[in-house]
Regions:
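N-terminal regulatory/sensing modules of transcriptional regulators
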Residues: 1-118
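Helix-turn-helix DNA-binding segment
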Residues: 116-138
């Protein structure tokens, strides 16, 4: 069974491009794209090992991903310090191609280790951020 990655972004072109790049960068992964959280949640029976989430969607659904920080990469246009300070990986899609690819290669897909050892994660709703930290993100 190949590791499953999720891209949650309302921009269809961005989804297609990132899926193609992920297939090029990571061998033997399945990549699923979703335009919103509702479609993602309807398909959440899959065991995703990493999530690439649009910054606006993550902002609105921070409670769903805060326990999955190591497995979540925020897709942003430009640097997004509020999410990186909160412990999320941030992928600035406005970077030059070489820098963007380098950043993707550095992202540690927690999933690889877990999938190779029989553990996988599902979306959880447990809370780890304090109310103050949540306010900073909002």
């Amino acid at each position: 069974m190949n590791p499953c990655l999720a891209i949650i972004d309302p921009n269809t072109l961005s989804n297609i491009a990132l899926r193609s790049v992920l297939w090029d960068v990571y061998n033997n992964v399945e990549v699923y794209t979703y335009g919103d959280m509702d479609s993602f949640i309807r398909d959440s029976n899959r065991h995703f090992v990493h999530f690439f989430v649009n910054s606006d969607i993550l902002f609105k659904h921070i409670d769903e991903f805060e326990t999955l920080k190591n497995q979540t990469t925020v897709i942003s246009v430009g640097p997004d310090k509020k999410f990186s300070k909160a412990g999320f990986n941030v992928l600035d899609i406005s970077l030059p191609e070489e820098e963007l690819m380098s950043k993707l290669l550095r992202i540690q897909l927690v999933s690889r280790y877990k999938m190779e050892h029989g553990n996988s994660s599902r979306l959880k709703s447990n809370s780890e951020l304090s109310p103050g930290e949540k306010d900073v993100l909002r």
